[in-house]
């Protein structure tokens, strides 16, 4: 080819790319008709052709026109791939555009099994990106193709060992995951046992996703959300969505009214929890005791090496120190205990009761892990297990720490706590006492290898937190005591000088306006302001006067007194304002009173609203002291950082274009 021909070809390519980038598809199709040699040419830096770009634009009509037009070169155009070996069907599947998938797939069904550079088929990408309808349609297109083997597993797995079930669970697409479980019943056991190159099974990923389970996701939600959550009824999915149902869903688009007011998200959350639990049960039904007992050790390198280590009864072998730099992937039971997935802990112990004896590389069993990661619900379940012997609770880790030692540790950095978070110490104390009361007697006096008892660890680790909260408590009490004293002084002055004065004719000192109805309001509110301001002042002064720095000084009432004092102070301010308004009623004429009335209403509403909105803050410590134990805040990370590792390994951006 001469230089002039090369230059002409480049000009055609630039013109074609410019028209496609600007969305001038009529010009592109016209050039397609006139220039046969540019139909498969790569026009972007990622070696995308025009059909790749048309799919990425999302215009299904343009894609259909191009596919229909190039029927003579259909095999060449449709199978053209970019620098990542992605065909147009790969892009359509990743976008979830069913219409484009149908058009391209019907033209060449063999593209469904075409792999890109990472070993991902269009079917795999549809599952990876949670495009349920596209996934189902590609699945039915594939199984209806001739020469399809029901035992062929290669199309459902990519190069790093991830199956479609791995990806659907890791990405949180549980609507796709439950379809996979039903569609590939004969492959579920193989998928469940399949470990990727990192050493993870789908059950590991499920255990590391606490938000997918009701017990952990609803924790801390508002009462309203919980009520709406309970209102919805979601049934378990008994079978996969049939092809006819997929076609019906594709034809109709339904938008329910509750999508607009937020109910839709709550329903989706309940669907996720229901299907996730169903997936967990299906996977565990196909698991074996050997699968549940394997701990993976791997040394990070360019080519990951995986060694399987089955735990033995010999404690010294199971607690052997791993090679420095070795990454340990624990059993699903241990991961579930760390993340607080009580549903999985219960089910595994029900099906595989001997797994209660498993320990990780640090010598911790699930009782120690639940205490270390402060998973209260898991700890409660373990305490209720009748099959657990006392030795399970008395077990210690490599450092000689029992469950009470681990519960006594602070478990969170002080800088991660909100300044003045007064419930922190209260929660820490209640958590420690809860574990102490749940454990066999005598553990509180046990020493670890550093010769520390649980009480020693608690005092030492919480010393700074206690000092910080005590300092904040004193400063807040001093500031509030000044305000409450001022309110007390004003309330006393108002109560002593009633509107209209006193009747001295009978030497009894009765108020002249005592029979007026508005005066009754003044009398009650001024007395209330005096009473509540006096109590709040006493509460604040009692806190300031108490200088004890021991742990026991934070165990009971300081925070409750502070918040009760603040509550009474705000109530006294409200009463003071009402008595002031009632006093003005006697001093102003009717015309002035009517003009001032809107101002009184606005200020009164703002004052009352302020008190009402602050009620949770005032009553929080009191309710916390009588409510069931809540775990103190802890900064945790998931045992499995799957998504980041996956993206780094594959480094795939399907939509990248120049």
Segments (PLM) and residue ranges:
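Inner-leaflet juxtamembrane helices
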Residues: 526-529, 533, 537-547
């Amino acid at each position: 080819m001469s230089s002039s021909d090369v230059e002409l070809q480049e000009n055609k390519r630039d013109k074609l790319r410019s028209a496609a980038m600007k969305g001038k598809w009529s010009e592109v199709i016209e050039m397609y008709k006139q220039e046969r040699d540019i139909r498969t040419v790569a026009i972007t830096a990622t070696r995308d052709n025009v059909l790749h770009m048309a799919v990425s634009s999302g215009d299904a009509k343009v894609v259909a026109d191009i596919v229909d037009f190039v029927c003579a070169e259909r095999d060449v155009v449709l199978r053209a791939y970019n620098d990542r070996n992605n065909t147009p069907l790969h892009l359509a599947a990743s976008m979830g555009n069913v219409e484009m998938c149908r058009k391209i797939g019907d033209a060449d069904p063999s593209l469904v099994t075409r792999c890109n550079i990472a070993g991902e088929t269009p079917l795999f990408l549809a599952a990876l990106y949670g495009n349920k309808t596209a996934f189902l349609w590609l699945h039915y297109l594939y199984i209806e193709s001739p020469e399809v083997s029901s035992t062929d597993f290669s199309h459902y797995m990519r190069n790093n060992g991830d199956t479609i079930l791995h990806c659907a669970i890791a990405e949180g697409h549980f609507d796709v995951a439950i379809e996979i479980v039903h569609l590939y019943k004969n492959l579920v056991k193989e998928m469940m046992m399949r470990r990727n190159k990192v050493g993870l099974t789908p059950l590991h990923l499920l255990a590391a996703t606490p938000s997918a389970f009701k017990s952990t996701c609803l924790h801390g939600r508002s009462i309203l959300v919980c009520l709406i959550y309970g209102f919805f009824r979601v049934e378990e999915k008994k079978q996969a969505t049939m092809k006819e149902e997929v076609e019906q869903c594709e034809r109709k688009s339904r938008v329910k009214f509750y999508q607009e007011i937020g109910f839709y998200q709550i329903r989706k959350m309940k669907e996720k929890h229901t299907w996730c639990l169903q997936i967990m049960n299906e996977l565990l039904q196909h698991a074996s005791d050997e699968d549940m007992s394997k701990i993976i050790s791997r040394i990070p390198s360019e080519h990951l090496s995986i060694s399987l280590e089955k735990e033995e009864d010999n404690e010294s072998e199971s607690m052997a120190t791993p090679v420095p730099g070795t990454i340990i992937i624990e059993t699903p039971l241990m991961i579930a205990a760390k993340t607080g997935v009580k549903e999985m802990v219960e089910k595994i112990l029900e099906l595989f009761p001997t797994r209660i004896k498993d320990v990780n590389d640090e010598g911790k069993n699930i009782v120690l892990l639940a205490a270390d990661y402060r998973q209260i619900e898991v700890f409660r379940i373990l305490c209720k297990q009748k099959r657990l012997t006392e030795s399970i609770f008395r077990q210690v880790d490599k450092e000689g720490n029992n469950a009470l030692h681990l519960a006594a540790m602070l478990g969170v950095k002080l800088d991660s706590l909100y300044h003045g978070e007064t419930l922190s110490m209260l929660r820490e104390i209640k958590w420690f006492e809860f574990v102490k009361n749940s454990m066999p007697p005598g553990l509180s006096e046990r020493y670890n290898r550093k010769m520390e008892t649980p009480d020693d660890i608690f005092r030492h680790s919480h010393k700074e937190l206690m000092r910080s909260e005590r300092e904040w408590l004193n400063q807040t009490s001093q500031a509030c005591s000044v305000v409450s004293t001022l309110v007390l002084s004003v309330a006393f002055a108002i109560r002593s000088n009633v509107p209209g004065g006193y009747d001295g004719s009978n030497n009894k000192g009765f108020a002249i306006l005592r029979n007026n109805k508005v005066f009754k309001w003044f009398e009650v509110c001024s007395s209330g302001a005096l009473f509540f301001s006096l109590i709040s002042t006493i509460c604040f002064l009692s806190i300031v006067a108490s200088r004890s720095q021991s742990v026991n000084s934070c165990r009971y009432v300081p925070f409750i007194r502070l918040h009760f004092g603040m509550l009474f102070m705000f109530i006294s301010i409200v009463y003071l304002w009402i008595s002031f308004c009632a006093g003005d009623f006697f001093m102003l004429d009717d015309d002035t009173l009517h003009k001032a009335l809107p101002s009184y209403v606005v200020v009164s509403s703002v004052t009352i609203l302020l008190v009402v909105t602050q009620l949770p803050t005032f009553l929080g410590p009191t309710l916390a002291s009588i409510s069931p134990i809540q775990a103190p805040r802890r900064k945790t990370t998931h045992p499995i950082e799957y998504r980041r590792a996956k993206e780094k390994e594959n480094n795939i951006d399907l939509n990248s274009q120049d």
